[in-house]
Amino acid sequence: MRILFLGSPSFAVHALEALVAAGHEIVGVVTQPDRPAGRDRRLTPPPVKIAAMAHNLPVLQPETLRDPTVVETLSALQPEVGVVAAYGEILRRAVLSIPPLGYLNIHPSLLPLYRGPTPVAGAILAGETVTGVTIMLLDPSMDSGPILAQAVVDLPPTARAGQLTDELFRIGADLLVQVLPRYARGEIEPRPQDHSRATVTKMLKKEDGRIDWSLPAIVIERMTRAYDPWPGAYTFWRGQPLRIIKAAVASADGTNVPGTVIGRSGSGHPLVQTGSDALELIEVQPASRRPMSGSAWLAGVHADNIRLGE
Protein backbone atom coordinates (compact mmCIF):
# COMPACT_ATOMS: atom_id res chain seq x y z
CA MET A 1 0.00 0.00 0.00
CA ARG A 2 1.04 3.61 -0.57
CA ILE A 3 1.55 4.94 2.96
CA LEU A 4 2.24 8.41 4.32
CA PHE A 5 4.03 7.99 7.66
CA LEU A 6 4.09 10.62 10.40
CA GLY A 7 6.24 10.16 13.50
CA SER A 8 9.22 11.60 15.34
CA PRO A 9 10.71 9.94 18.49
CA SER A 10 12.70 6.74 18.79
CA PHE A 11 9.74 4.54 19.69
CA ALA A 12 7.94 5.61 16.48
CA VAL A 13 10.76 3.99 14.50
CA HIS A 14 9.33 0.55 15.36
CA ALA A 15 6.23 1.25 13.26
CA LEU A 16 8.20 2.63 10.30
CA GLU A 17 10.54 -0.37 10.29
CA ALA A 18 7.59 -2.78 10.52
CA LEU A 19 5.86 -1.16 7.53
CA VAL A 20 9.04 -1.28 5.45
CA ALA A 21 9.62 -4.93 6.40
CA ALA A 22 6.03 -5.76 5.40
CA GLY A 23 6.73 -4.47 1.90
CA HIS A 24 4.57 -1.35 1.92
CA GLU A 25 5.49 1.63 -0.24
CA ILE A 26 6.28 4.58 2.00
CA VAL A 27 5.56 7.60 -0.23
CA GLY A 28 6.66 10.09 2.40
CA VAL A 29 7.89 10.34 5.98
CA VAL A 30 6.78 13.45 7.84
CA THR A 31 8.72 14.20 11.01
CA GLN A 32 9.56 17.16 13.22
CA PRO A 33 12.33 19.58 12.19
CA ASP A 34 15.86 19.07 13.49
CA ARG A 35 16.17 20.63 16.95
CA PRO A 36 19.10 21.65 19.18
CA ALA A 37 19.93 18.90 21.68
CA GLY A 38 22.58 18.00 24.22
CA ARG A 39 24.86 20.24 26.21
CA ASP A 40 26.35 21.75 23.07
CA ARG A 41 22.84 22.36 21.63
CA ARG A 42 23.86 20.78 18.36
CA LEU A 43 21.15 20.55 15.71
CA THR A 44 19.91 16.94 15.91
CA PRO A 45 17.53 15.08 13.57
CA PRO A 46 14.57 13.14 14.99
CA PRO A 47 15.14 9.37 15.20
CA VAL A 48 12.43 8.77 12.57
CA LYS A 49 14.35 10.92 10.08
CA ILE A 50 17.51 8.89 10.65
CA ALA A 51 15.61 5.63 10.11
CA ALA A 52 13.86 6.96 7.00
CA MET A 53 17.12 8.10 5.42
CA ALA A 54 18.64 4.68 6.08
CA HIS A 55 15.90 3.27 3.83
CA ASN A 56 16.22 6.11 1.27
CA LEU A 57 12.68 7.25 1.99
CA PRO A 58 11.56 10.81 1.16
CA VAL A 59 11.54 12.96 4.31
CA LEU A 60 9.53 16.10 4.98
CA GLN A 61 10.11 18.29 8.06
CA PRO A 62 7.55 21.10 8.06
CA GLU A 63 7.31 23.45 11.04
CA THR A 64 3.55 22.90 10.96
CA LEU A 65 1.00 20.96 8.92
CA ARG A 66 -1.31 23.97 8.89
CA ASP A 67 0.63 25.55 6.04
CA PRO A 68 -1.46 25.20 2.83
CA THR A 69 1.68 24.55 0.76
CA VAL A 70 2.52 21.62 3.04
CA VAL A 71 -0.99 20.22 2.57
CA GLU A 72 -0.53 20.47 -1.21
CA THR A 73 2.82 18.69 -1.00
CA LEU A 74 1.34 15.83 1.03
CA SER A 75 -1.65 15.54 -1.29
CA ALA A 76 0.65 15.28 -4.31
CA LEU A 77 2.17 12.13 -2.81
CA GLN A 78 -1.19 10.39 -3.36
CA PRO A 79 -1.10 8.08 -0.33
CA GLU A 80 -3.79 5.45 0.07
CA VAL A 81 -3.55 5.58 3.86
CA GLY A 82 -1.66 7.42 6.57
CA VAL A 83 0.02 6.03 9.68
CA VAL A 84 0.74 8.19 12.73
CA ALA A 85 3.05 7.25 15.60
CA ALA A 86 3.74 10.10 18.04
CA TYR A 87 4.17 12.77 15.38
CA GLY A 88 3.74 15.73 17.71
CA GLU A 89 0.88 17.73 16.15
CA ILE A 90 -2.88 17.20 15.94
CA LEU A 91 -3.89 16.75 12.30
CA ARG A 92 -6.43 19.18 10.87
CA ARG A 93 -9.21 18.28 8.46
CA ALA A 94 -7.23 19.42 5.41
CA VAL A 95 -4.55 16.83 6.19
CA LEU A 96 -6.95 14.16 7.45
CA SER A 97 -8.83 14.21 4.15
CA ILE A 98 -5.79 13.44 1.97
CA PRO A 99 -5.64 9.60 2.10
CA PRO A 100 -8.87 7.86 1.03
CA LEU A 101 -8.54 5.34 3.89
CA GLY A 102 -7.71 7.97 6.51
CA TYR A 103 -4.99 7.66 9.15
CA LEU A 104 -4.26 4.77 11.50
CA ASN A 105 -2.75 5.91 14.79
CA ILE A 106 -0.82 3.95 17.41
CA HIS A 107 -1.80 5.10 20.91
CA PRO A 108 -0.13 3.51 23.97
CA SER A 109 -3.20 3.01 26.15
CA LEU A 110 -6.48 1.14 26.13
CA LEU A 111 -8.66 3.91 24.74
CA PRO A 112 -10.85 5.63 25.73
CA LEU A 113 -8.68 5.58 28.88
CA TYR A 114 -5.69 7.91 28.98
CA ARG A 115 -6.18 10.00 25.89
CA GLY A 116 -3.69 12.78 25.31
CA PRO A 117 0.09 13.22 25.29
CA THR A 118 1.20 11.22 28.37
CA PRO A 119 -0.87 8.03 28.59
CA VAL A 120 1.91 5.83 29.95
CA ALA A 121 2.77 8.23 32.74
CA GLY A 122 -0.93 8.55 33.53
CA ALA A 123 -1.39 4.80 33.86
CA ILE A 124 1.64 4.43 36.14
CA LEU A 125 0.59 7.33 38.35
CA ALA A 126 -2.88 5.81 38.73
CA GLY A 127 -1.43 2.49 39.85
CA GLU A 128 -2.93 0.53 36.96
CA THR A 129 -2.01 -3.15 36.75
CA VAL A 130 -2.79 -3.48 33.05
CA THR A 131 -2.40 -1.14 30.11
CA GLY A 132 -2.17 -1.69 26.39
CA VAL A 133 -2.00 -0.24 22.92
CA THR A 134 -4.75 0.84 20.54
CA ILE A 135 -4.82 1.05 16.75
CA MET A 136 -7.41 3.69 15.93
CA LEU A 137 -8.59 5.95 13.13
CA LEU A 138 -7.82 9.62 13.59
CA ASP A 139 -10.52 12.26 13.62
CA PRO A 140 -10.16 16.02 14.24
CA SER A 141 -10.38 15.60 18.03
CA MET A 142 -7.64 14.24 20.27
CA ASP A 143 -7.54 10.42 20.40
CA SER A 144 -11.32 10.12 20.05
CA GLY A 145 -11.58 8.25 16.75
CA PRO A 146 -12.96 4.73 16.28
CA ILE A 147 -10.94 1.71 17.36
CA LEU A 148 -9.67 -0.95 14.96
CA ALA A 149 -7.76 -3.20 17.39
CA GLN A 150 -6.31 -3.32 20.89
CA ALA A 151 -3.72 -5.39 22.74
CA VAL A 152 -3.73 -5.71 26.54
CA VAL A 153 -0.34 -5.59 28.29
CA ASP A 154 0.53 -6.20 31.93
CA LEU A 155 1.79 -3.16 33.82
CA PRO A 156 4.16 -4.46 36.51
CA PRO A 157 4.75 -2.42 39.68
CA THR A 158 8.34 -1.73 38.58
CA ALA A 159 7.49 -0.39 35.10
CA ARG A 160 9.16 2.85 34.06
CA ALA A 161 7.52 5.16 31.54
CA GLY A 162 10.35 5.29 29.02
CA GLN A 163 10.85 1.54 28.81
CA LEU A 164 7.13 0.78 28.84
CA THR A 165 6.42 3.30 26.09
CA ASP A 166 9.02 1.65 23.88
CA GLU A 167 7.54 -1.79 24.59
CA LEU A 168 4.00 -0.62 23.79
CA PHE A 169 5.07 0.89 20.49
CA ARG A 170 6.87 -2.36 19.57
CA ILE A 171 3.65 -4.24 20.24
CA GLY A 172 1.69 -1.57 18.42
CA ALA A 173 3.91 -1.84 15.36
CA ASP A 174 3.28 -5.59 15.13
CA LEU A 175 -0.45 -5.05 15.60
CA LEU A 176 -0.46 -2.31 12.97
CA VAL A 177 0.95 -4.47 10.18
CA GLN A 178 -1.64 -7.16 11.01
CA VAL A 179 -4.55 -4.73 11.05
CA LEU A 180 -3.67 -2.54 8.06
CA PRO A 181 -4.35 -4.99 5.19
CA ARG A 182 -7.52 -6.28 6.85
CA TYR A 183 -8.79 -2.75 7.32
CA ALA A 184 -8.01 -1.91 3.69
CA ARG A 185 -10.02 -4.94 2.54
CA GLY A 186 -12.99 -3.89 4.67
CA GLU A 187 -12.67 -6.86 7.02
CA ILE A 188 -12.54 -4.73 10.20
CA GLU A 189 -15.47 -2.63 11.34
CA PRO A 190 -14.22 0.46 13.22
CA ARG A 191 -15.70 0.53 16.73
CA PRO A 192 -16.71 3.92 18.17
CA GLN A 193 -15.21 4.78 21.54
CA ASP A 194 -17.37 5.08 24.63
CA HIS A 195 -16.69 8.75 25.29
CA SER A 196 -18.38 8.56 28.70
CA ARG A 197 -15.44 6.45 29.93
CA ALA A 198 -12.74 8.73 28.54
CA THR A 199 -9.90 10.05 30.69
CA VAL A 200 -7.40 12.63 29.47
CA THR A 201 -3.72 13.15 30.29
CA LYS A 202 -1.86 16.44 30.17
CA MET A 203 1.40 17.64 28.69
CA LEU A 204 4.07 17.37 31.36
CA LYS A 205 6.07 20.34 32.60
CA LYS A 206 9.36 20.32 34.49
CA GLU A 207 7.65 21.38 37.72
CA ASP A 208 5.35 18.33 37.61
CA GLY A 209 8.32 16.27 38.75
CA ARG A 210 8.94 18.25 41.94
CA ILE A 211 8.15 16.08 44.95
CA ASP A 212 5.68 17.22 47.57
CA TRP A 213 6.72 15.19 50.60
CA SER A 214 3.27 15.55 52.16
CA LEU A 215 1.97 13.13 49.53
CA PRO A 216 1.79 9.40 50.38
CA ALA A 217 4.96 7.42 49.73
CA ILE A 218 3.18 5.24 47.15
CA VAL A 219 2.33 8.32 45.07
CA ILE A 220 5.91 9.61 45.17
CA GLU A 221 7.29 6.17 44.28
CA ARG A 222 5.02 6.10 41.22
CA MET A 223 6.29 9.55 40.24
CA THR A 224 9.86 8.20 40.07
CA ARG A 225 8.72 5.73 37.42
CA ALA A 226 6.04 7.75 35.62
CA TYR A 227 8.34 10.73 35.08
CA ASP A 228 11.28 8.69 33.79
CA PRO A 229 13.13 9.80 31.72
CA TRP A 230 11.55 13.29 31.81
CA PRO A 231 10.87 15.43 33.79
CA GLY A 232 12.15 13.10 36.50
CA ALA A 233 11.01 13.08 40.12
CA TYR A 234 13.15 15.50 42.07
CA THR A 235 13.51 17.36 45.34
CA PHE A 236 16.00 19.86 46.74
CA TRP A 237 18.78 19.59 49.29
CA ARG A 238 20.64 22.73 50.32
CA GLY A 239 19.08 24.55 47.39
CA GLN A 240 20.34 22.06 44.78
CA PRO A 241 18.13 19.60 42.88
CA LEU A 242 18.30 15.93 43.85
CA ARG A 243 16.68 13.50 41.45
CA ILE A 244 15.09 10.39 42.94
CA ILE A 245 15.60 7.68 40.33
CA LYS A 246 14.52 4.57 42.20
CA ALA A 247 12.59 4.29 45.45
CA ALA A 248 10.46 1.95 47.52
CA VAL A 249 7.71 2.36 50.09
CA ALA A 250 8.64 1.59 53.70
CA SER A 251 6.51 1.66 56.83
CA ALA A 252 6.72 4.64 59.19
CA ASP A 253 4.57 5.95 62.03
CA GLY A 254 4.13 9.39 60.47
CA THR A 255 5.12 11.48 63.50
CA ASN A 256 7.98 13.26 61.71
CA VAL A 257 7.81 16.26 59.40
CA PRO A 258 7.43 15.18 55.74
CA GLY A 259 10.75 15.39 53.90
CA THR A 260 12.78 14.48 56.99
CA VAL A 261 15.32 11.67 56.73
CA ILE A 262 14.24 9.47 59.64
CA GLY A 263 16.78 6.67 59.36
CA ARG A 264 18.27 4.03 57.10
CA SER A 265 16.83 0.92 55.53
CA GLY A 266 18.40 -2.49 55.97
CA SER A 267 20.40 -1.74 52.81
CA GLY A 268 21.66 1.53 54.23
CA HIS A 269 19.51 3.75 52.05
CA PRO A 270 17.89 6.87 53.54
CA LEU A 271 14.28 6.66 54.67
CA VAL A 272 12.31 9.86 54.14
CA GLN A 273 9.08 10.65 55.96
CA THR A 274 6.13 11.34 53.66
CA GLY A 275 2.48 12.13 54.25
CA SER A 276 1.87 8.41 54.68
CA ASP A 277 4.66 5.88 55.30
CA ALA A 278 8.30 6.50 54.38
CA LEU A 279 10.16 6.42 51.08
CA GLU A 280 13.41 4.49 50.74
CA LEU A 281 15.75 6.33 48.36
CA ILE A 282 17.48 3.49 46.52
CA GLU A 283 19.09 5.48 43.69
CA VAL A 284 19.51 9.24 43.41
CA GLN A 285 21.32 11.78 41.26
CA PRO A 286 22.61 15.03 42.75
CA ALA A 287 23.02 18.07 40.50
CA SER A 288 25.92 17.71 38.00
CA ARG A 289 26.73 14.23 39.33
CA ARG A 290 26.28 10.71 38.10
CA PRO A 291 23.52 8.51 39.55
CA MET A 292 24.51 6.84 42.82
CA SER A 293 22.99 4.67 45.50
CA GLY A 294 21.01 6.39 48.20
CA SER A 295 23.43 5.04 50.78
CA ALA A 296 26.41 6.58 48.94
CA TRP A 297 24.65 9.93 48.78
CA LEU A 298 23.80 9.81 52.48
CA ALA A 299 27.39 8.93 53.38
CA GLY A 300 28.64 11.95 51.46
CA VAL A 301 26.22 14.46 52.94
CA HIS A 302 27.91 14.68 56.36
CA ALA A 303 24.88 16.25 58.01
CA ASP A 304 22.39 15.49 60.73
CA ASN A 305 18.71 16.40 60.73
CA ILE A 306 18.40 16.24 56.95
CA ARG A 307 15.18 17.64 55.55
CA LEU A 308 14.61 17.42 51.81
CA GLY A 309 12.67 19.92 49.77
CA GLU A 310 14.58 22.96 50.99
Swiss-Prot record:
GO cellular component, one term: cytosol
Swiss-Prot/TrEMBL catalytic activity: L-methionyl-tRNA(fMet) + (6R)-10-formyltetrahydrofolate = N-formyl-L-methionyl-tRNA(fMet) + (6S)-5,6,7,8-tetrahydrofolate + H(+)
GO BP annotation list: conversion of methionyl-tRNA to N-formyl-methionyl-tRNA
Alphabetized CDD domains for the sequence: FMT_core_Met-tRNA-FMT_N (cd08646), Met_tRNA_FMT_C (cd08704)
InterPro entries: Fmt, Formyl_trans_C, Formyl_trans_C_sf, Formyl_transf_N, Formyl_transf_N_sf, Formyl_transferase-like_C_sf, Met-tRNA-FMT_C, Met-tRNA-FMT_N
EC supergroup of this enzyme: transferase
Protein name: Methionyl-tRNA formyltransferase
Organism this protein belongs to: Chloroflexus aurantiacus (strain ATCC 29366 / DSM 635 / J-10-fl)
Lineage: Bacteria, Bacillati, Chloroflexota, Chloroflexia, Chloroflexales
